[in-house]
Amino acid sequence: MRLARRSSQHGIALIIVMISIFVLTMLAAGFAYSMKVETMLARHASNETALQWLGRSGVEYCRWILVLQATCPAEPYDSLNQAWAGGSGGPCSTNGPLAELEQEVHLGQGSFTWKITDLDAKANINTAGEGMLEKALMLMGVDAADMTPIVNSILDWIDPDDQTRIEGTESDYYERQRPPYQAKNGPIDDISELLFIKGVTPYLYWGPASSNSPPNPLLEKLNPFGSRDRTPNYQVGLVDLFTPISSGKININTASAEVLQLIPGVDQIIAEAIVAGRQGEFDPTGLTGPYRTVAEVRRIPEVNMLVQRQIEQFCDVRSRAFRVEINAKIGASSRTFYAIVVRPTPRETQVVNFYWKY
């Protein structure tokens, strides 16, 4: 009996020891994991400032590129075949600083890649009138019965008064929504503001980009307007046609055929002919390649005198507003920065906005 009791006590002691070892092992593993997480957080936190300065350096690099391009006398235009847009480049890119541009720039312990997008390749939503908005909806394939409410709701959102247009929408309607809000009654600052406007659904905003997946539930909550029992198949989205920041003139060297069709008198055939006409290598005679002046569009057989006058009124060959995207990286840490850069004169650029997304 005494031996059995001792054996039982030894067994209990062994179990207690094993449990203690297991608990201590789990505590040690948890502590090691938490220390690893804290170390990673500390490393990322220490890189935050450096990443931001890398992003700002990338923006300055792009400003330098834009000034170099604008001050090149051999290329009095902005086009997609130039180095700033990722193209092979024209005469100014064969030698000099533009010929030595690096897509990935190494700076200190980090690096950044850059991308410049021409905002003047789209129409300005704040200056687009009723006719241009209607033409955009026709191009997208919106039902004729829905055009007037959407167009007038957009114009009511932008205009400074509270007078409701025919089938339009002002604050008295938006204040009854959940959550309630008011009409902007001012210029659109971000193109995504369109999603707050009655009639502008995520499908209408994104176009084909929204057809492969259901819309963001938050966007549908913010914009409950329109039918949800069917998925519209729009040819293009409002985000592809308009921008809130631009000079107000469309660059015929960078605009898509869809954007060019927003110009009065320009149909699909003319727009595609204009796009095709700007292709090819630089030609100092102006017969092929990018348009050096808007008047050179007359070399396109499909463009008659009346259409040329409309193009000269709405278009330019110089761009003055750009969106810069910088991807900064230090070790395993990375951050994407964005900036809106305007170029009022060939030798002057200004950063209107600098931001990043988590």
Briefly describe each language-model feature range.
Residues 2-358:
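Compositionally biased linear targeting/interaction segments
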